[in-house]
């Protein structure tokens, strides 16, 4: 995924009234809990600001992504989509202090109806999303992005809560398909030849779900012939997030894109709701009720 290289005029001010209105939410909107962790949407501009700080710690301090000087000064990963997206959070409620100090993970969610009113999807800067959307005029799409979790919370529980939140949100808004960028570290696709080739030959989107990288950015994923691929080793070489998408039943677009600012090689994940594995629907609950029981 790409970090926008914004100047100070392009940095979103989370204190403005528009964002305050956009993220206003009641205190009863918790989507799931596991022990001391809970997931819900951001309720205030201050919580969005705290989520941007978590993203900065992961994307810039850990992954060495490049950001604009103003974003670096503020130590926030910020772009223009923050003002229009919903921000899914995972909080550790055992941490003393305000909610802003408890945020340990975040996801950014952008519904199609919102994107069409406000300038489009983030992923469209790398992939030909418009072609996919035009093929499904009656379906509702949602983009997932800016997923990150602090290192000490990269556990099964945290990932489960993020997916619980995504699933509950998708059900609430009648979403038919989700998509978003998945990233490999580094800007040399050939270094990930095994994993990229495995995705290309085994889970590439086809027919009505076909979508590809923008022609001017397209990098082939077909780097090894099928007979040369060891599936077990290929699966082990996949980044955890992409592997998680595959387990759910996701497909991958045709072609990768090198993101120089983020220092990653990106692929497009496409997950139609109707293709989600029955195993995971049973696990999370068809009504997203798996982890939604109130605290006793």
Swiss-Prot record:
EC code(s) of this entry: 2.3.2.30
Pathway entry: Lipid metabolism
Protein purpose: Catalyzes the first step in the biosynthesis of ornithine lipids, which are phosphorus-free membrane lipids. Catalyzes the 3-hydroxyacyl-acyl carrier protein-dependent acylation of ornithine to form lyso-ornithine lipid (LOL).
InterPro entries for this protein: Acyl_CoA_acyltransferase, Ornithine_N-alpha-AT
Pfam hit, one: Acetyltransf_5
PANTHER family, sorted: GCN5-RELATED N-ACETYLTRANSFERASE, L-ORNITHINE N(ALPHA)-ACYLTRANSFERASE
Keyword Lipid metabolism among record annotations: yes
Name of the protein in its database record: L-ornithine N(alpha)-acyltransferase
Organism: Rhizobium meliloti (strain 1021)
